[in-house]
Amino acid sequence: MLHIKTLAMLTMAASGSLVYAQQPPAAPAAPAFMGPCSNLTCEVLNDWMRNNVMVYGVANAMPAEKYAFKPTPEQQSFGERVLHVAQINVTLLQGLGAKTPAPAIDPKAVSKAEAMAAVQKAGDYGNAIIKEFGDQQLTVRVSSPWFMGPMSTRQRIIYFLMMHSQDTYGQLVVYLRLNGITPPASRQP
């Protein structure tokens, strides 16, 4: 785990320096990892943060002037896909019954600075909710989105969101490569 953490931090540092000139000055930083875990909350939180670092990294890799890029006219733009991750994360996290207030995500915020800020807000919201629930509450069954059946554990819904984010991440990688950009995760030795 320590090797993965170190490698992730080095990759983030290297990719950040390569795209610093492209990143808006007000863009939020990617979250740090908690470290080795001994309980469910820590594991879920580490996975959530790792997932958000990947999404944030791929969003940051695309230059601001390319955020409107669409592989085909029928597809969403890069910025719309990034914003989609933030929107779905906040929407489904709101259904988990947390006391932590949800951040407002502007559905029309598709500039690089706005989309990255939305991803950061959604990630921070997830961090707060996971910490709020803790081990016992993460395993409680709640009403779930229709496509997951009538009831699911909070943990399952959070992992669904990570899976969905990774699916969208894969799409965003194609957008980057179509623009001649190597995704941050592919820059690792």
Predicted regions mapped to residue ranges:
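Acidic/histidine-rich alpha-helical segments that form the ligand environment
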Residues: V58, V110-P145, M151-Q166
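Short, contiguous alpha-helical
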Residues: L45-Y56, K66-I105, S144-P189
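Surface-exposed helix-capping loop/turn segments at secondary-structure junctions
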Residues: A61-Y67, I130-T139, R177-P183
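Boundary at the C-terminal end of the N-terminal hydrophobic targeting segment
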Residues: V19-A21
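Bacterial N-terminal signal peptides that target proteins for export
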Residues: M1-A8
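Short N-terminal segments immediately surrounding and downstream of signal-peptide cleavage
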Residues: Q23-M49
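Acidic/histidine-rich, surface-exposed loop or edge segments in extracytoplasmic proteins
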Residues: A30-L40, L96-K108
